[in-house]
């Protein structure tokens, strides 16, 4: 996986800000990206445009994984980048979905507890 350090943090922050992605939305969004990237018909139909979209989606997932790993594991950006580079695309998706799945489910539980207490 290739990364451009100059744009990684900045570009990811812009995407998150533009789309106002909350944790639950991140999980759903990343899951949709993973599903879309596997659709053979879509790749054939959209051709080069699809490749560009998929490439951008893959870069965003890589950057998100690096950022999350730095935050979660307390390691340097370079160490996190090396770990992510060694992972397959499937492993990266699973890593992100596992994190956001746990985070969104804990938020859901809190919402249920709060709503039942009133």
Curated annotation (Swiss-Prot):
Superkingdom of the source species: Eukaryota
Molecular functions (GO terms): toxin activity
Residues in the signal sequence: 1-3
Any Gene Ontology biological process: defense response to bacterium
Major place of residence: secreted
Tissue: Expressed by the venom gland.
Pfam families in the record: Latarcin
Subcellular location field: Secreted
GO cellular component: extracellular region
Purpose of the protein: Insecticidal, cytolytic and antimicrobial peptide. Forms voltage-dependent, ion-permeable channels in membranes. At high concentration causes cell membrane lysis.
Family: Belongs to the cationic peptide 06 (cytoinsectotoxin) family.
Protein name as it appears in the record: M-zodatoxin-Lt8p
Species this chain originates from: Lachesana tarabaevi
Name of the gene: cit 1-15
